[in-house]
Amino acid sequence: MGLEALVPLAVIVTIFLLLVDLMHRRQRWAARYPPGPLPLPGLGNLLHVDFQNTPYCFDQLRRRFGDVFSLQLAWTPVVVLNGLAAVREALVTHGEDTADRPPVPITQILGFGPRSQGVFLARYGPAWREQRRFSVSTLRNLGLGKKSLEQWVTEEAACLCAAFANHSGRPFRPNGLLDKAVSNVIASLTCGRRFEYDDPRFLRLLDLAQEGLKEESGFLREVLNAVPVLLHIPALAGKVLRFQKAFLTQLDELLTEHRMTWDPAQPPRDLTEAFLAEMEKAKGNPESSFNDENLRIVVADLFSAGMVTTSTTLAWGLLLMILHPDVQRRVQQEIDDVIGQVRRPEMGDQARMPYTTAVIHEVQRFGDIVPLGVTHMTSRDIEVQGFRIPKGTTLFTNLSSVLKDEAVWEKPFRFHPEHFLDAQGHFVKPEAFLPFSAGRRACLGEPLARMELFLFFTSLLQHFSFSVPTGQPRPSHHGVFAFLVTPSPYELCAVPR
């Protein structure tokens, strides 16, 4: 084919692509559609978004366009919601209409399918309801909110304190030990087992979980989701979700081993056994979400999300204690007054410890570890803050804009536990405290996370005083964004009290 023949073909293809692009842009011209930066042909606003620091980028766009603004990622329409009023209106007032998740084409690489979507990324429908109901009821049956699970956590907290004590007051990074302790609670719930802190396979699993969550953000990921036809290019598809694939492979080995010890005649000892029991009941039902493929994804959801978010919050907590020794001393005084230095902390103590409770909540607010939450999608046309958002629009809920809202918090960019105390020193929780999101897709692990944060945090401060190592500079209080916001690397000294 000569060059002369290629020219008209190129013109036809170009016109076709421009028409397709025009079709995807047309909603921008609809009445009351949210404003936003002008999208480029084909790419949309992909080049306008800094995926290495998306929260900051969204904050800058909010200053230009307001609390509700629009983007177009290739041909995917997106609306970003900022501030308490907009976020609550979308997720609570229109809860049924915003409970869906947008399609995530790259998850096909991990084995996602119509009946195997896990819990967190599952589309809003029968499969999600089935798994949400199962997860909540199973966690409750395994002891969530009861003394049995509380005892698991306090025993793991004792192991964590012993590991801290092994450093004999010398400088070390606490993140790894925090990961291990929190992961053992999740492993007990999901697989009925506890790992030693130096178990090589356990360490590998934790590394893969950490790296896998970092793959939840990035330019290439967004491009492949926006233009899924590119997934057919092996060189591109092979570059994404490598750690998540390796994590699932490691998890498959644990689940295979666990199946060999399962006795269907006995009550389930953990979530995996409860899931296997449901699979037996669902045999012959092709519509059931209880299947081998979904088992691995549900367990992976609970393991990775439950481990990394809680351990990261604890890492923020210890960092803020060494940066604010006055706050640390006041927490320790309250621990000494209510619990003493011998008895293990219990959840029943929390009601008598308003300052410690306020500090933990302020750690969550200031750390702001999941700044953009998980994306939602509208299942019908809705109106938010006077703007019309069409059906099928992807929603980013900027939780950071709520947790750092200058109209709500007295000192939004400073660590200030008094945000959660009234004039009499009683604990109060403002409406804008939404680290677990809100509405129908709010984090199902919130009760477990609250228990772990209180018991691990109070156990550590009961046994140790934390400080910046002598001769080292004061650590930064700025975080590092990679889907989650983690503290900048730091060391501390844990001196027994």
UniProtKB/Swiss-Prot annotation:
Gene that specifies this protein: CYP2D6
Q: What is its main location?
A: endoplasmic reticulum
Xref: InterPro entries: Cyt_P450 (IPR001128), Cyt_P450_CS (IPR017972), Cyt_P450_E_grp-I (IPR002401), Cyt_P450_E_grp-I_CYP2D-like (IPR008069), Cyt_P450_sf (IPR036396), Cytochrome_P450_fam2 (IPR050182)
Summarizing the function annotation, the protein's role is: A cytochrome P450 monooxygenase involved in the metabolism of fatty acids, steroids and retinoids. Mechanistically, uses molecular oxygen inserting one oxygen atom into a substrate, and reducing the second into a water molecule, with two electrons provided by NADPH via cytochrome P450 reductase (NADPH--hemoprotein reductase). Catalyzes the epoxidation of double bonds of polyunsaturated fatty acids (PUFA).
EC class: oxidoreductase
The entry's keywords: Cholesterol metabolism, Endoplasmic reticulum, Fatty acid metabolism, Heme, Iron, Lipid metabolism, Membrane, Metal-binding, Microsome, Monooxygenase, Oxidoreductase, Steroid metabolism, Sterol metabolism
A single GO cellular-component term from the record reads:
endoplasmic reticulum membrane
Which terms does the UniProt entry file under GO BP?
Answer: arachidonate metabolic process; cholesterol metabolic process; retinol metabolic process; xenobiotic metabolic process
**PANTHER family found in the cross-reference section:** CYTOCHROME P450 2D6-RELATED (PTHR24300:SF1), CYTOCHROME P450 508A4-RELATED (PTHR24300)
Tell me the lineage of the source organism.
Eukaryota, Metazoa, Chordata, Craniata, Vertebrata
Q: Which residues bind substrate?
A: D301
**Can you say where in the cell this protein is located?**
Endoplasmic reticulum membrane; Microsome membrane
Q: What name has this protein been given in UniProt?
A: Cytochrome P450 2D6
